[in-house]
Amino acid sequence: MQLCARAWGLRLGRGAGGGHRLARGTGLSWAQRSRDSSGGGGGGGGGDRGAAGASRLLERLLPRHDDFSRRHIGPGDKDRREMLQALGLASIDELIEKTVPASIRLKRPLKMEDPICENEILETLHAIASKNQIWRSYIGMGYYNCSVPQTILRNLLENSGWVTQYTPYQPEVSQGRLESLLNYQTMVSDITGLDMANASLLDEATAAAEAMQLCHRHNKRKKFFVDPRCHPQTIAVVQTRAKYRGVLVELKLPHEMDFSGKDVCGVLFQYPDTEGKVEDFTELVDRAHQTGSLTCCATDLLALCILRPPGEFGVDIALGNSQRFGVPLGYGGPHAAFFAVKENLVRMMPGRMVGVTRDATGKEVYRLALQTREQHIRRDKATSNICTAQALLANMAAMFAIYHGSQGLKHIAKRVHNATLILSEGLKRAGHQLQHDLFFDTLKVQCGCSVKEVLGRAAQRQINFRLFDDGTLGISLDETVTEKDLDDLLWIFGCESSAELVAEGMGEERRGLLGSSFKRTSPFLTHQVFNSYHSETNLVRYMKKLENKDISLVHSMIPLGSCTMKLNSSSELAPITWREFANIHPFVPLDQAQGYQQLFQGLEKDLCEITGYDRVSFQPNSGAQGEYAGLATIRAYLDQKGERHRTVCLIPKSAHGTNPASAHMAGMKIQPVEVDRYGNIDVAHLKAMVDQHKENLAAIMITYPSTNGVFEENIGDVCALIHQHGGQVYLDGANMNAQVGICRPGDFGSDVSHLNLHKTFCIPHGGGGPGMGPIGVKKHLSPFLPSHPVISIKPTEGTWPVGTVSAAPWGSSSILPISWAYIKMMGGKGLKEATEIAILNANYMAKRLEKHYRVLFRGARGYVAHEFILDTRPFKKSANVEAVDVAKRLQDYGFHAPTMSWPVAGTLMIEPTESEDKAELDRFCDAMISIRQEIADIEEGRIDPRVNPLKMSPHSLTCVTSSCWDRPYSREVAAFPLPFVKPENKFWPTIARIDDIYGDQHLVCTCPPMEVYESPFSEQKRASS
């Protein structure tokens, strides 16, 4: 790997001899200095000394000026000095000594390569990406090449205003993406023919596992039928999930399924199936329903544009992958899975869901609905452990549907189907046998000649097929297939006719699905939004209108505790849309993805060095998925040791809600551990719990630093205690941003962690996903890491893998270059510095705010970690002001709220990250101090306790510019409460405060159909939609 400017000499010329161009036409290029110590002849050692002297002079003349860490870390030297002075400290080293226990501090620098220049990182990544070979892949199995509209790529996927938003917990500043996600839900509901859909899940396979769990929850039965013609990765993920949920999965063809025992919770089938066959499942659905079993259909949205939807033959749950709606393959992800249900199952549905409610003025608005069923509230009793899903990719798919409309989607579907019909006819003419007569886009072919010969000809054209175990070949076509592609496919199979000649021989008679009883006749996407933005001009304006409604990192800091909303730099994000990363099918042979393999290996090596673990699995594609995978790995390890009875998992009460939800998913029995008044694990209670459950102890789940924002002094003792009693230590990586370069979980006793790459390592949050949650493990757990049924991702000898946890072998592969680039550009020193500044920023803010709010928890020497909790509970009694009032009022100051009422109800948790400079920290602190003064005004009777800027917040532009203003405070106080909040730079909430209760009581989670717009809108029609 090349070094930066200091390792290069400057040379005039045209770049002869392999120099790397600085810029076209400049006549300048870089040439690497010789490392030959011989001096090159008669000059002897003097030549070396002259070269060394020249080098030092050159470094002085051409000092490095593109140190990425200086771009990533907000506070400069002056800011740091001032913050340290405010804390009464002489240096950052002193701060770290007083914050992080000496017993766990890393005594050496991280062993990592020197940082790569920001300008050079893209060149290095280009070299890696070029090792990926972009063949035409007709493998299918839920993954298809597609045409990504450039307007969506540029204005959404590559737009920081869309990708740096957080999950829309604050709807008043999130109406844009909430509307887009409602469009996505409507799209899914319409196309599948079901009543309600959620706002995305992680991938098709995990959506199928969630469907199985829903069936099990619904009727408490413990047998689940799976049609073996589902995609193999889907079957594997369902089997892995079922193993720890006590559900028996049986692979049965429909005619083999016996429901007479009334012990079957549900059945899963694929429509069209993995071989491409379209068949009628009506009879199976009816048989299942007669005995109270639910039916789950894995399906394809594009196929359903011309194929009878599952909702029309009684299916209860439909699921699948929306990837082919304008989202790149990306070697497996990220993609948005869809999940739709009948209305009677909506309150059991996993994942986030957008619904309609009203704001304080009565205006219809959007919000996240039914949150009481989610992990952050219900913990181990939640419908799922899902936290981050795939909002950004769901938004892309929704925009794809909006851009094309129903007619455009039908056109694409018919084109794909017609191409498949032409290919099928040509193959039959060439003497090959098709296994199925009715299909959409996939053919299973019994070759009439040598398969080896066919595959050899395919390799000549750089084309991939699917090879079935029985020696047949699978060919799945997509919307990018051209006439030339068809000609190449026909040539590979020895057909002497061209696609044009085959088509002419077929004529225009309706064939295939369009001439069968399976043809779709019902309308879909009738809502106005899918019929208004078919020109690029209109779509760009619509996307911009939505973007402008949402606060993101382009506006101001997002101080959400435990969320690490740091910079997502352009250099890190740029490579994810390169075709060498974007256009690779996840199941291509490994020799076609050598660039990806090199990147995985390098990232794994760096993450192991950073964490102290020995191996990393990249398969989990979210933090919650990583928790489940890590705990399941522990279960597999204990099972192999003959300790299957160990199922108790200890979890502190301060833990994130995903912890107990994930432990429950892994089949563990949760035992809560108390937290003392200082925010630490109550060691006495922990010891009592360990002693009580020592025979059955499987693990403890801890977060470090704790969710209360402190480095607990006795973390090593806690880990040792668990190990002494036969348990394993799972350390939640949510707060890894306070550890990198300073301490390593693998050194102080942790056995496994998930790493939130979308927090610590700069993958953007995307408004609610994507995320990545790879797990790092110590050596003894490495043989149990996840495997995959299609692609071998680890040696099989001496391993007992836990199973498969995600659809793709390496999860959401295409966003891993972001974290790789961040680590390479920062280097070991820069990564440690980022951690130090994150801790400095948090302590500076805590210091500024401590005179106005109580800082709830501090470490042993009075300092916080990278985040801290402000106690707003006393204001409920003194002024009838709650945390939610402070959160909404912050919107008027231009800020997203901190994490609200977690981990302690009635509080606010603040995490500034290292990317924010002192000026931004001060603006936020000024806002909080100003709000405290507004609370004091209520306490002291200077303003009305019911009608005041806090209770009436946020103040939208419509509100402030209304001709009627009857509030006992001025418009200026409402909208411009401090000098830095100015008309020219203010972010405006677009609605008044929402009514959560009304939204859950009047659940509407799709857009109404076009008929609504034929007459004045009515509540009755909206409810019936």
Curated annotation (Swiss-Prot):
InterPro entries per record: ArAA_b-elim_lyase/Thr_aldolase (IPR001597), GcvP (IPR003437), GDC-P_C (IPR049316), GDC-P_N (IPR049315), GDC_P (IPR020581), PyrdxlP-dep_Trfase (IPR015424), PyrdxlP-dep_Trfase_major (IPR015421), PyrdxlP-dep_Trfase_small (IPR015422)
Subunit structure: Interacts with GCSH. Homodimer. The glycine cleavage system is composed of four proteins: P (GLDC), T (GCST), L (DLD) and H (GCSH).
Summary of the function given for this chain in its UniProt record: The glycine cleavage system catalyzes the degradation of glycine. The P protein (GLDC) binds the alpha-amino group of glycine through its pyridoxal phosphate cofactor; CO(2) is released and the remaining methylamine moiety is then transferred to the lipoamide cofactor of the H protein (GCSH).
Organism: Mus musculus
Highest taxon in the source lineage: Eukaryota
Modification N6-acetyllysine, positions: K452, K519, K653, K669
Cofactor(s) this protein requires: pyridoxal 5'-phosphate
EC category: oxidoreductase
EC number(s) recorded for this UniProt protein: 1.4.4.2
Keyword Transferase: no
Free-text activity regulation comment from the record: Stimulated by lipoic acid. Inhibited in presence of methylamine.
Gene Ontology cellular component list: glycine cleavage complex; mitochondrion; nucleoplasm; plasma membrane
NCBIfam families membership: gcvP, PRK00451.1, PRK04366.1
A matching Pfam family: Beta_elim_lyase
Protein name from the UniProt record: Glycine dehydrogenase (decarboxylating), mitochondrial
Record's keyword terms, sorted: Acetylation, Mitochondrion, Oxidoreductase, Pyridoxal phosphate, Transit peptide
One record GO biological process: cellular response to leukemia inhibitory factor
Extent of the transit peptide: 1-35
Residue segments, region Disordered: 16-51
Chemical reaction(s) catalysed: N(6)-[(R)-lipoyl]-L-lysyl-[glycine-cleavage complex H protein] + glycine + H(+) = N(6)-[(R)-S(8)-aminomethyldihydrolipoyl]-L-lysyl-[glycine-cleavage complex H protein] + CO2
Taxonomic placement: Eukaryota, Metazoa, Chordata, Craniata, Vertebrata
Bias-annotated ranges (Gly residues): 38-50
Gene symbol of the encoding locus: Gldc
Localization, UniProt: Mitochondrion
Modified residues (N6-(pyridoxal phosphate)lysine): K759
Molecular function, one GO term: glycine binding
Family the entry assigns: Belongs to the GcvP family.
